[in-house]
């Protein structure tokens, strides 16, 4: 059940070995591979096959290792999935007041995300960034979109953390959140979604805290 960390992981041979070892002894070891996206030499076989940097080579090796294990152990319950993260700037405007001078008022009304997030930010990236700041949440956990019917931007992470990126908080949404069972251990809202409705914000905190 250990976690193996490999800096400068190259083609991810460590990940390959760990996956094979798990398959052999039914272990549950996990791995974290860290590698700069160094470009492959243009004369190399990897480059000729379409892999422009060593990270792409590593990802393909992990995929092939997983496929090989699945073919060799067709009836085994083995997790061969993996996630890929890249170092990047923040997706969130943590100090919106500093950016207000750069925001068009009409744009604020038609695109509320302009207030809170950088252009092009995706919900999944925002959720992961928020979870990174929780310190004790593994990034291997699943993200689940829990509602529909007009509330497509509310997510449950690791079955414990609720991240609500809806542009407007409503009483109907709060009712839905209060009905969740089991209840998340933490709720994360965007302040702008309350649209300066202090009474609604107080009611939201009161109801969810009381639960």
Please tell me what each predicted stretch does.
Residues 2-21, 131:
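A phosphate-binding catalytic loop at a beta-strand-loop-alpha-helix junction
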Residues 1, 21-211:
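Accessory, often C-terminal, charged low-complexity segments
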């Amino acid at each position: 059940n250990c976690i193996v960390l490999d800096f400068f992981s190259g083609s991810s041979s460590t990940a390959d070995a760990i996956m094979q070892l798990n398959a052999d002894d039914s272990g549950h070891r996990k791995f974290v591979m860290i590698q700069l996206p160094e470009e492959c030499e243009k004369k190399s076989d990897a480059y000729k096959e379409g892999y422009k940097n060593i990270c792409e080579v590593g990802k393909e090796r992990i995929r092939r290792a997983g496929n090989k294990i699945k073919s060799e152990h067709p009836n085994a319950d083995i997790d061969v999935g993996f996630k890929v993260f890249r170092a990047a700037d923040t997706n969130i405007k943590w100090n919106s007041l500093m950016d207000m001078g750069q925001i068009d008022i009409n744009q604020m009304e038609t695109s509320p995300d302009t207030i809170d997030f950088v252009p092009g930010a995706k919900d999944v990236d925002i959720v992961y960034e928020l979870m990174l700041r929780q310190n004790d949440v593994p990034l291997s956990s699943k993200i689940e979109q829990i509602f529909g019917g007009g509330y497509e931007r509310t997510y449950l992470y690791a079955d414990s953390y609720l991240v609500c990126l809806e542009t407007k908080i409503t009483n109907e949404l709060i009712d839905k959140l209060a009905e969740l069972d089991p209840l998340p251990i933490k709720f994360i809202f965007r302040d702008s979604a309350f649209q300066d409705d202090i009474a609604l914000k107080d009611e939201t905190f009161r109801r969810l805290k009381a639960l």
